[in-house]
């Protein structure tokens, strides 16, 4: 199985641009990947929210929205499955979520369990976290999803023998990554699983240098350069 870790630019509050980026990655990955993974909140951009619920609910998307339906259509059209981070609206609540789509179907919808995605000192009860960390099955293989701070706050809840996919939004400087942050993330990932795929989007406002990484037993074994759009293809047996 070939998994593509997509470190592409996304723009805050610009779903149309971000959708084009997703489709572009799918077009470029035809015949090269079975599954493409994008970073946390890639659909809307991690800093898309203003913490005013009446405004924020307009940019959030329901799981059965037309936007998610278009992604489902693309998984059929291009023959590539997707894992995409997005701001989810469910009833009167908002979540930082990640949806798994394959062959036109919703395989799994994960909601971040840690609160670091929001300005929790000023947000109200509309901004929520999930409480489930179950695995899902893709191409006959069990996998687990965690979003960014989940592995820092609750690593024990993700301990498993299977592959862990870890979409994040982390905007360290390149120097900070090189001077220890990357090793810290690899070590933290190892508290949960031997094999972890971490995906970080590129952003211009604020600056996020992106990067995609494959960690094995606490060591980075494959990555793509910072500040350059790319797709890291990882073979998983």
Residue spans of the language-model regions?
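Catalytic metal-binding/acid-base residues of hydrolase active sites
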Residues: 9, 42, 87-88, 150-152, ...
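Conserved hydrophobic/aromatic positions in well-ordered beta-strands
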Residues: 4, 99-101, 213, 232-234
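Active-site-proximal beta-strand elements of phosphoester/diester hydrolases
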Residues: 1-14, 135, 140-150, 165
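Active-site catalytic loop in hydrolytic enzyme cores
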Residues: 89-159, 173-182, 236-237
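N-terminal glycine-/serine-/threonine-rich phosphate-binding loop
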Residues: 1-35
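Residue-level detector of high-confidence beta-strand sites
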Residues: 97, 109-111, 166, 223-225, ...
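Cys-nucleophile CN-hydrolase/nitrilase-fold catalytic domain and related Cys-dependent amidase chemistry
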Residues: 24-102, 172-194
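CN hydrolase (nitrilase-like) catalytic-core segments centered on the catalytic cysteine
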Residues: 63-81, 152-230
